């Protein structure tokens, strides 16, 4: 989560915690704190406190994404080397807000204000097997190439969450139904 924990976040945490307990799994707490406008210490502390007060104990040491920037940059480099990502010069007013992160991050990939985008494949239908909704298919042509590294060298949620899911060997994601009705297929499948 990011920002204030709201009832939808509590519901999703509860469902995730219950699912993990029922299936002898693990409930992980990961704080997406790459967006500093919504990632203050007050927000982080309130999320952790609220989940603890509700008895939703996590099974891991809390993962703070801001502490893994170097690892994310390594993954972006791998994607660039495999031609699965590319540099893109964007206008300043596009969704590449500047951030005032009070931490040191690795900006070795910056090329004169370029962002780095993930290169989506466009040939094969994207099929997802959802435990609630069944099989969901997406036409890859409606997906845009998402920014995975901002021009200031800060990785985006689109990258960090996928890398962490792989590293943490996440097998199930529990998301709100809003993502299935979103006009953006990226939101529905992320």
Provide a role label for each language-model segment:
Residues 10, 29, 96, 107, ...:
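Short, intrinsically disordered low-complexity segments
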Residues 25, 56-59, 188-190:
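Secondary-structure boundary/capping residues
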Residues 1-48, 143-179:
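N-terminal catalytic cores of NTP/NDP-binding nucleotidyl/phosphoryl-transfer enzymes
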Residues 180-190:
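Single conserved hydrophobic/aromatic residue that forms the stacking wall/gate
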Residues 40-150:
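Active-site neighborhoods of enzyme catalytic cores
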Residues 22, 124, 171, 187-188:
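A very general structural signal that marks isolated residues within well-ordered alpha-helical segments
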